[in-house]
A protein has these predicted regions:
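Short N-terminal binding/cap micro-motifs at the start of the first secondary-structure element
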Residues: 23-26
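Residue-level signal for inorganic ion chemistry
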Residues: 21, 44, 65, 105, ...
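Short, surface-exposed acidic-centric catalytic microdomains
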Residues: 29-73
Length: 167
């Protein structure tokens, strides 16, 4: 698809969490640069370190990215994000919690919640809360920013570094 074709399409505002626990700092920075090729990066959260969940392994680094893109959610996920994960060396196994070079999760698209576990997982809630603090939990109405504060304490998530959009 040419740049002109992309300009003529409706733009979508998508929040994506970039996660990695294999060569995590390098892969996080590279992935954010690669996301910039899929649209315009509007904002990038701080990078947070969270313990690996569900299996032994190095801690994860997680960063939320707010992206404006002409790609619809299915094209973005299945043609671009999955390919990017593979290009970064991710191997999918039966173990959903296995260490990985890159994990790209779509959290919201056009203000619609995609990741239903956002409010339960520190690795998602904490970085996303920096970009979308007013997002509310559909069942309780609790603000994501409030939930993230609790999850930071519960999981010992810690801020590692910040990446500027476009760097």
């Amino acid at each position: 698809m040419s740049a002109a074709d992309l300009r003529d399409r409706a733009l979508h505002r998508v929040c994506i969490v970039v996660g990695s626990n294999i060569d995590a700092e390098v892969n996080t920075r590279r992935a954010i640069r690669a996301l910039g090729k899929l649209g315009k990066i509007l904002a990038v959260s701080s990078t947070w370190e969270t313990p690996s969940a569900g299996s032994p392994g190095p801690d994860f680094l997680d960063t939320a990215v707010l992206l404006e893109t002409a790609y619809d959610i299915d094209t973005l996920k299945w043609q671009h994000l999955r390919r990017m994960e593979t290009d970064f060396g991710r191997v999918r196994t039966a173990d959903k919690n296995a260490p990985r070079t890159l994990d790209l999760d779509i959290i919201t698209c056009d203000d619609r919640l995609i990741a239903s576990d956002l409010f339960d997982r520190a690795y998602l809630a904490v970085p996303v809360s920096e970009l979308l603090p007013g997002l509310t939990q559909p069942m309780t109405g609790a603000l994501l920013s409030q939930i993230a504060t609790v999850l930071i304490k519960r999981t010992l998530a810690r801020k590692r570094f910040s990446i500027q959009a476009g760097s």
